[in-house]
């Protein structure tokens, strides 16, 4: 199927190096984008579906890189069904598991956590809630695991690994585990900051640097932040991606963004939610964090959208997150909210307001079926 989106007000690329794309149209064929910016009259005539954006802003589908997936569209943490479809209505077209740690009675032995990760991965290969793409199955690192265990899950399709909730005695125990997981080819993430569940312990800034994962999860606190001085050290002296989350400390979120920009490390700055957790379920979490940073600090909205799209895709090696030819056709239309003081979505977000999102309340876009 071919779909044309026309009369777009602005196109946000998802690329932190060039955040806006000139033009007013996007063409999709099958599951991929084929043209972004300019399309021909023939492209429009040949399309099966034509969407008139009516001046709305097009952005890449948002990627939430910190979602505590379990099984199905259900979270036992808040006993809620349908939360992933709600996130889709909030513009999130891709969710990435932050480990299936909330599964009731979840195993803590190597064989058990391996089986859990593989089962989650396999289930979501066959299930897309509301159409959302879910990268599930994040291996929880537990004592006794070896490089053979990491290679075993990799051979079954699992590529994510999470440190921070295992039954280790101290944070330093994760240093060799994360190192071996990385050598095996797993993409490693680390709980950062204060303890978030009973029986766990804090991961300090010094621990983070020593463990050296690919991504520091909720570096701004999950929900309690690490010491301020480490934000500059991580941005300046490491290659660790700095993920800030809605369910964390807003002050250190802005501090992290400022340090990332200061040290030319903004490509490693990621925006996520860290939900569902005790902090709740946040379908608009990414939108709120973008608007909060933009309105309280000197950051452009398109750059912050990139932190929740293209930056994440580049970090995790995904084919989504960018509005460019060849990428997954994940497109979200956003607009100024009804009753707001601003005239377009980007200005609304800069003003600290949430934006209207395409499928449920974008006031200008409409679908025209081509005969």
Label the predicted regions.
Residues 9, 31, 55, 360-365:
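Glycine-centered positions in the ABC transporter ATPase nucleotide-binding domain
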Residues 77-84, 142-153, 198-207:
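Short, acidic/polar
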Residues 328-371:
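C-terminal cap of metal-dependent C-N hydrolases
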Residues 83-112, 124-141, 155-168, 186-189, ...:
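Divalent metal-dependent hydrolysis catalytic cores, especially in the metallo-beta-lactamase
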Residues 159-280, 297:
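Active-site core of metal-dependent hydrolases
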Residues 1-44:
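N-terminal metal-binding scaffold of metallo-dependent hydrolase/deaminase domains
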């Amino acid at each position: 199927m071919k779909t044309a989106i026309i009369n777009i007000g602005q196109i946000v690329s998802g690329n932190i190096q060039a955040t806006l794309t000139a033009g007013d149209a996007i063409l999709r064929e099958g599951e991929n984008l084929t043209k972004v910016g300019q399309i021909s009259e023939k492209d429009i005539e040949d399309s099966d579906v034509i969407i008139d954006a009516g001046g709305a802003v097009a952005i890449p589908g948002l990627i939430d890189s910190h979602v505590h997936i379990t099984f199905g569209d259900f979270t036992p943490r808040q006993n809620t069904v349908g939360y992933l479809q709600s996130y889709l209505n909030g513009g999130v077209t891709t969710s990435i598991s932050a480990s299936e740690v909330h599964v009731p009675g979840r195993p803590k032995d190597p064989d058990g956590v391996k089986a859990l990760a593989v089962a989650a991965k396999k289930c979501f290969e066959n299930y897309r809630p509301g159409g959302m793409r879910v990268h599930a199955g994040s291996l929880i690192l537990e004592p006794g695991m070896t490089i053979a265990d990491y290679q075993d899950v990799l051979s079954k399709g699992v590529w994510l690994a999470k440190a921070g909730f295992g039954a280790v005695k101290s944070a330093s125990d994760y240093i060799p585990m994360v190192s071996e997981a990385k050598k095996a080819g797993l993409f490693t993430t680390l709980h950062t900051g204060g303890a978030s569940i009973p029986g766990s312990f804090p991961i300090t800034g010094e621990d983070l640097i020593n463990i050296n994962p690919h991504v520091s999860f909720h570096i701004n606190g999950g929900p309690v932040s690490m010491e301020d001085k480490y934000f500059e050290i991580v941005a300046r002296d490491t290659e660790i991606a700095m993920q800030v989350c809605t369910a964390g400390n807003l002050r250190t979120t802005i501090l992290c963004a400022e340090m990332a920009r200061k040290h030319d490390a903004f490509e490693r700055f990621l925006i996520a939610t860290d939900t569902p957790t005790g902090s709740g379920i946040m379908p608009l979490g990414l939108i709120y964090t973008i608007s909060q940073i933009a309105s309280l600090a000197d950051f452009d909205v398109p750059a912050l959208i990139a932190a929740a799209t293209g930056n994440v895709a580049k970090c995790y090696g995904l084919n989504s997150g960018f509005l460019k030819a060849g990428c997954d056709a994940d497109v979200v239309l956003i607009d100024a909210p009804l009753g707001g003081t601003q005239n377009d979505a980007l200005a609304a977000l800069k003003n600290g307001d949430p934006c209207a999102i395409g499928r449920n309340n974008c006031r200008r876009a409409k679908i025209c079926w081509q005969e």
